[in-house]
Amino acid sequence: MMVHCAGCERPILDRFLLNVLDRAWHIKCVQCCECKTNLSEKCFSREGKLYCKNDFFRRFGTKCAGCAQGISPSDLVRKARSKVFHLNCFTCMVCNKQLSTGEELYVIDENKFVCKDDYLSSSSLKEGSLNSVSSCTDRSLSPDLQDALQDDPKETDNSTSSDKETANNENEEQNSGTKRRGPRTTIKAKQLETLKAAFAATPKPTRHIREQLAQETGLNMRVIQVWFQNRRSKERRMKQLSALGARRHAFFRSPRRMRPLGGRLDESEMLGSTPYTYYGDYQGDYYAPGSNYDFFAHGPPSQAQSPADSSFLAASGPGSTPLGALEPPLAGPHAADNPRFTDMISHPDTPSPEPGLPGTLHPMPGEVFSGGPSPPFPMSGTSGYSGPLSHPNPELNEAAVW
């Protein structure tokens, strides 16, 4: 039975043949379909076709993101994010310098690079979409460096204008949702500690201090400046929040408290417009329940008042005496005209508490009514209260009790 070649499909009449892909081949038919080179030791196949090593990786292997050519397994490559580049293709598009591993660079249009020095010194690339590749993965700071390209050569110490520019950039980012963010710069923990220590010493560092920090940390001066701006903005927000919290705390923790029942009250709040007096926090002797001491304002009460509305007390409590109802007369020239006192004055046989001249009023001690000493205030007909009472009232007169 004749054996046919898998390449030319002709019978194999040669003494030697090659077995590729479990099929017999002429020696001359085992060749690369691209370069027509005979393959004797090793070959690659795809879709039934044979390829040499170089052509196979060039056609089906990983493509270089710079030149769009295939990458051979023996070639040295550099990777930036998910892209792979030849060494010769991994160069700065401005100065054509080959970029080494770990060096910070900026990717433009996904396949072009700008080294750090050229990026910072150039102002013509701000319209491109920028991406940064860094070897550090600890902590990140993402300032908007797209708008800062033209500000770097003209960097000044005016931090106020820088803060305004940062606020404007934030507003622009909020307004345009499709706007891409700037490159992400990584800050290590040690660098962050250095920046925090410098901020604690000087919240608004000068250009000279920023240059020193750039030398110590290895960060860009613009990154340091933006970090300080963000830090100052954060401090201001924290102060505003703390001040607002303190005001709210004072408002909710210190409301207008209700006065205790035993506390002092102002006479206008306690008495209002009534003509009667009020006893305050008197620390001395006090009136026992049922005592018949009472005081009323100057002038006789009107006849329309009922006994409950007036200041007269009936002697029906435990402090009553054999004298019956004690009603002190009003002091003044119209005391005899009051019908309440006509009966008391017209009866000469009314018992008197102690001997004396008829018609003479004598003060009676408080022990008779309450079992204790009388309150320490003078029995005067014209002077107002003073001393232990809570408030003076010059218009209030006092009548003697008999």
Curated annotation (Swiss-Prot):
Residues 124-135, 300-311, 322-336 have a biased composition (Low complexity). Gene3D superfamilies: Cysteine Rich Protein, Homeodomain-like. Expressed in fetal brain and in various regions of the adult central nervous system including the spinal cord, the thalamus, and the cerebellum. Pfam families: Homeodomain, LIM. Residues 124-186, 298-402 are annotated as: Disordered. Its main location: nucleus. GO terms for biological process: cell proliferation in forebrain; cerebellar Purkinje cell differentiation; cerebellar Purkinje cell-granule cell precursor cell signaling; forebrain neuron differentiation; hippocampus development; neuroblast proliferation; neuron differentiation; positive regulation of DNA-templated transcription. Transmembrane segments: none annotated. InterPro entries: HD, Homeobox_CS, Homeodomain-like_sf, Lhx1/5_LIM1, Lhx1/5_LIM2, LIM_Homeobox_TF, Znf_LIM. Residues 151-167 have a biased composition (Basic and acidic residues). Disulfide bonds: none annotated. Residues 3-61, 62-125 form the LIM zinc-binding domain. GO terms for cellular component: chromatin; nucleus. Keywords: DNA-binding, Homeobox, LIM domain, Metal-binding, Nucleus, Repeat, Transcription, Transcription regulation, Zinc. The keyword Transmembrane does not apply. It comes from the Eukaryota. It is found in: Nucleus. Residues 180-239 bind DNA. One of its GO terms (molecular function) is DNA-binding transcription factor activity, RNA polymerase II-specific. Plays an essential role in the regulation of neuronal differentiation and migration during development of the central nervous system. This is LIM/homeobox protein Lhx5.
